[in-house]
């Protein structure tokens, strides 16, 4: 089932998916912005400073405030060298309970460039997380095989973004009126945007490296996939 208004707003949802009216109202406001050709609310649509859980198509204009300060937020899935048969949840919980936050775990910057993220290797607040997982059931053998996941190993899923670096980009480019495409300012924003996406991905990797190293399983860490869900896509 979809909710449509003025041919520019679509909400993807069904009868089991309750969406706050405030979020729908915010989505309508976004759809009315100059240059917006389509605004789509996804099943996780909810209100924020701007609506969260949306995809917005624009023409000749960029709205950095719709992306917000968590540039590059996404998910990274990593395969550890911890065998499932040797995994003991109580051991991990006890060890992790000895620290209050990942910033307490010191680690060298694993990249050659200086990090613009001052607290590289931290998850952040909100709905961000790091979670150890195991494969119990495979529903798509072809895709699973293409990822070359070893079912005998523990996986680590990290949800995080560019941390304080994204805040600084937002402070500099958060024009509520938008930025015209093709301008020098648009080019400067996209340069910062792309760098934030790169370091958000690197931050997720560093979170995984920190956790596995702290727990004694740092060697053999492999990135299975890394997907960003908060960014500007050029078409």
State what each model feature region is.
Residues 2-25, 34-40, 47-54, 61-64, ...:
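Domain-length cofactor-binding catalytic modules of enzymes
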Residues 78:
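Iron-sulfur (Fe-S) cluster-binding segments and ferredoxin-like electron-carrier domains
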Residues 100-109:
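Long, basic N-terminal domains or extensions that often function
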């Amino acid at each position: 089932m979809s909710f449509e208004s003025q041919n520019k707003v679509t909400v993807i949802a069904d009868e089991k998916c309750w969406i706050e009216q405030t979020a729908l109202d915010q989505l309508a406001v976004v759809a009315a912005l100059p240059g917006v050709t389509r605004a789509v609310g996804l099943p996780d649509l909810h209100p924020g400073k701007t609506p969260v859980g949306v995809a917005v198509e624009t023409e000749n204009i960029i709205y950095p405030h719709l992306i917000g300060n968590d540039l590059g937020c996404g998910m990274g899935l990593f395969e550890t060298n911890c065998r499932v048969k040797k995994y003991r949840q109580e051991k991990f919980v006890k060890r992790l309970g000895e620290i209050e936050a990942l910033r307490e775990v010191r680690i060298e910057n694993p990249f050659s460039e200086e990090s613009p993220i001052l607290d590289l290797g931290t998850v952040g607040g909100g709905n961000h997380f790091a979670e150890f997982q195991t494969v119990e059931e495979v529903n798509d053998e072809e895709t699973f095989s293409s990822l070359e996941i070893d079912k005998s190993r523990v996986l680590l899923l990290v949800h995080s973004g560019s941390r304080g670096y994204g805040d600084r980009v937002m402070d500099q480019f958060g024009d509520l009126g938008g930025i015209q495409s093709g301008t020098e300012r648009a080019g400067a924003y996209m340069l910062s945007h792309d760098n934030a996406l790169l370091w958000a991905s690197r931050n997720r990797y560093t979170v995984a490296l920190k956790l596995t190293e702290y727990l004694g399983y740092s060697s053999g860490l492999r990135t299975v996939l890394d997907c960003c869900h908060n960014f500007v896509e050029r078409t």
